[in-house]
Structures are given as C-alpha cells and as structure tokens.
Curated annotation (Swiss-Prot):
The lineage of its organism: Bacteria, Bacillati, Bacillota, Bacilli, Lactobacillales. It is found in: Cytoplasm. Homodimer. The active site is at 154 (nucleophile). SUPFAM superfamilies: Thymidylate synthase/dCMP hydroxymethylase (SSF55831). This is Thymidylate synthase. It is an enzyme of class 2 (transferase). Catalyzes the reductive methylation of 2'-deoxyuridine-5'-monophosphate (dUMP) to 2'-deoxythymidine-5'-monophosphate (dTMP) while utilizing 5,10-methylenetetrahydrofolate (mTHF) as the methyl donor and reductant in the reaction, yielding dihydrofolate (DHF) as a by-product. This enzymatic reaction provides an intracellular de novo source of dTMP, an essential precursor for DNA biosynthesis. It comes from Streptococcus agalactiae serotype V (strain ATCC BAA-611 / 2603 V/R). InterPro entries: Thymidate_synth/dCMP_Mease, Thymidate_synth/dCMP_Mease_dom, Thymidate_synth/dCMP_Mease_sf, Thymidylate_synthase, Thymidylate_synthase_AS.
Length: 279
C-alpha cells in the first residue's frame, strides 16, 4: 500500500467517524439542494517525492492530465479566460463557475498571478538567493474579491524552500488549502501542485524534495457516503505511481508543456466511481 493510499483511507475513516456536519453550506447540487458535508479540520500530509512518494491514490483512477493543464492556465498563461482553458487545453469543468456572461471566473487564480507578476518574481527570488525564506505564492487577494464575483481560491497559498543535501539542491513545497473535497479533488489538487513544484525545480536544474499539504477543511459531501464506503472496501493496487517531467534540467519554466509530464507505473482500481458535484 502506498503512502497516499494509506492516508486516503485514514482520512476517509476519520471524516466518517469523527467528522461533523456543515450547516448553511454555500454550494448546491444540480437539483438545487444545499450541498452539506461531513468534515474535519487541520488535515496534514507529507510526501518525500525524492523517495518516490507521490500524492495519488490507486483506489480509483485520478484524471490528472486535465488538472495539470489547469496549472499551466493559471501559472503560464496567467489568465482567468475560460476560452483559453477550453480551446487551448480542452478543459471545460471550470465553465460551471463562469461569472455572469463574462467568459471568465472573475478576478481569480491566473488573473491574480498576472496582476502581481507572481511567477517571474518568485523565479527571480530563487535565482538571486535560493535560501531566502520569502518564496510565497498567495492567491488570496481581497482587492480582487471586491472587484468581481467568483469562487474564492481553494488552493490559495504555496511556499517553497531549498535544501542542500550531499551536494545537491532540493526544492520543497508547501501547499495550503482552505477547503478540499476528499473523494473527488484531494489527489487532483495535490498532484497539480507537485507538477508546479517540478516545473520550478527543472527551471533551475534542482531535484524535487518534499511536498507538504495542509488543508483547513477536509470534507466528504453528504451525497458521497456510499462511494466513501466503497473506497474503504477496495484493496489498493500493487503499483507505485510517479509523475515524471521529461525535459532537460534548466528548461525555462515557460517553455515546459503539459505533454512533457508522464504518470508512470499507475494501474488504479476500477471501475471508476461517479460523483454528483457541488457547485
């Protein structure tokens, strides 16, 4: 059993046995009903990517190709334009969060990255002094929230640190998330930001180190309890999945493409489960 599978089962068990129910939830199911959830607070996980520990379960198939494309939309294209996400990457799931008829998700995510020139500043800081302790990406922008409507960012802060071990430099990353749908989005969000970590490490020719993941509110929606029990019954696959970035060390961050990533040794348990999402 991989570390990701062990943590997945532990978190599902903890939510179902110790979690409390939300009240006055904002999200709605497609039938208009309030989408409440059972949740725990303060969930934390640590993965040592350099030792082959990756945050992706084998208990069900996790579609990370589209998730990685979303990272490119946010941090390379640096836009909130849904047409870019739809036409360039073939990803449409953000369309449910379109603000009015603007064709955007409001001043969120990529728009905030562009507004503050976040990636270029981060890369410059790491180039000037890899050991500085100020390598922070924050998408929590109150001014932007007041400017337009839109879903507030869930994965809103990422921090990076560099370590020298036996003469090699390792890039560590910490992702902070205010809210996470355990069964649907947990491993998608984690692997997205592992991909971002790998892109930054490749830019400098460093190795990827540890990935730390903190979630304030980790939940299972009240229409997903049957799927939760099914996942607990499943025995994990014997595979040991790893994400690989197939570009030379020193490849510029903005020259990396989604197809440069490959998920290897991944043979998840099937069939896939169906989820009615809360919007």
């Amino acid at each position: 059993m991989t570390k990701a599978d062990l943590l997945f089962k532990d978190n599902i068990t903890k939510i179902m046995s110790e979690g409390v129910f939300s009240e006055q939830a904002r999200p709605r199911y497609k039938n208009g009903e309030m989408a409440n959830s059972k949740y725990i607070t303060g969930a934390f996980a640590e993965y040592d990517l350099s030792k082959g520990e990756f945050p992706i379960t084998t208990l069900r198939p996790i579609p990370i190709k589209s998730a990685i494309k979303e990272i490119f939309w946010i941090y390379q294209d640096q836009t909130n334009d849904l047409a870019v996400l739809n036409d360039k990457y073939g990803v449409t799931y953000w369309n449910d969060w379109e603000v009015g008829h603007t064709g955007t998700i409001g001043q969120r995510y990529g728009a905030v990255v562009k507004k503050h020139n976040i990636i270029s500043k981060l890369l410059k800081q790491l180039e000037d002094n890899p050991w500085n302790r100020r390598n922070v990406i924050s998408l929590w922008d109150y001014e932007a929230f007041e400017e337009t409507e839109g879903l507030l960012p869930c994965a809103f802060q990422t921090m990076f640190d560099v370590r020298r071990v036996n003469g090699e430099l390792y890039l560590d990353a910490t992702l902070t998330q205010r809210s996470n749908d355990m069964l649907v989005a947990h491993h998608i969000n984690a692997m997205q930001y592992v991909a971002l970590q790998m892109m930054i490490a490749k830019h400098f020719g460093w190795r990827v180190g540890k990935f730390f993941y903190f979630i304030n509110n980790l939940h299972i929606y009240d229409n997903q309890f049957e799927q939760a029990q099914e996942l607990l019954k499943r025995q994990p696959s014997e595979c040991n999945p790893k994400l690989v970035l197939n570009v030379p060390d020193g490849t510029d961050f903005f020259d990396i493409k989604p197809d440069d990533f490959a998920l290897v040794d991944y043979d998840p348990i099937k069939p896939q489960l169906r989820f009615d999402l809360a919007i």
